[in-house]
Amino acid sequence: MAMLSYDEAIHIANVQYTLVKSQNIVPFLDMALRFPEYAKENICLLMVQDPEEVTEFRTQREWLECGTHLLPDVRPITLALFKSQSILYVFDVSQTDQQRSLLPPNAEKAYHALIQTLGQEPVELEESKNRVAYYDLTEKQWYVNLKSNHSARFRSIAAILVSKLLEKETGIDAIVTTDMVVYMLCKKYGISPEGINLKAMQDSLRRITDTAIADNSIRMAMHCMTIHPLRDLDAYYQGQIKQLEMERKQQAEQEALQAEQQKQAEEKR
């Protein structure tokens, strides 16, 4: 199978990585670059509260071996563990590169690999090509979100980012302001603003009895669209890529230097 180029992997990732968390998206970029054939929109399924809490990603081989047994066109899933929660998330990548020539893993083998990873039998998952599932190790129960389409994920991640930007602001209605910003982001990037429309926002503003708070909410929403990183998500994303490239280059140079020093030390013995 033809591997995607670096630029193609970057392009298909698009703004969705950026919206996950403004401070650190390196784990997501790293996943995209290590497994570019799976790096399309569904990498954003790794929508966690804090990307820095990701402690482990499975290897590509393990990734391929872990799948779901329910669908006839079974696709791989990926597992990630988090420090602060006793939860093992399972992300369905069934909507990833539909044109890829790579065959899906054997369903029975994939199912047993998943059971081995979890350490016990999960309850039956609901059938859905838009599935995002996770297994709660405390409750020992599978949970499935069937409404994980692209637009819903974009709106959800955008709302998380905007909420973080507004959490220290006073004199505004944070919920209304968030809705306004998410609506504008959706319109800007061609995402369906389903559930957030102009009439609903107008009604919400009318329900604010304090006119100063209503006015401040509108001004803050407009201001949010002018500040980093919402001002230009694509430019922000490219900046993160350059930073990642620089870090990787420095790491490679450091490893090469250490290897050379070790070689010289061994030759002197």
Q: Where on the chain are the PLM-derived regions?
A:
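N-terminal accessory/interface modules of nucleic-acid-binding and processing proteins
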Residues: 1-269
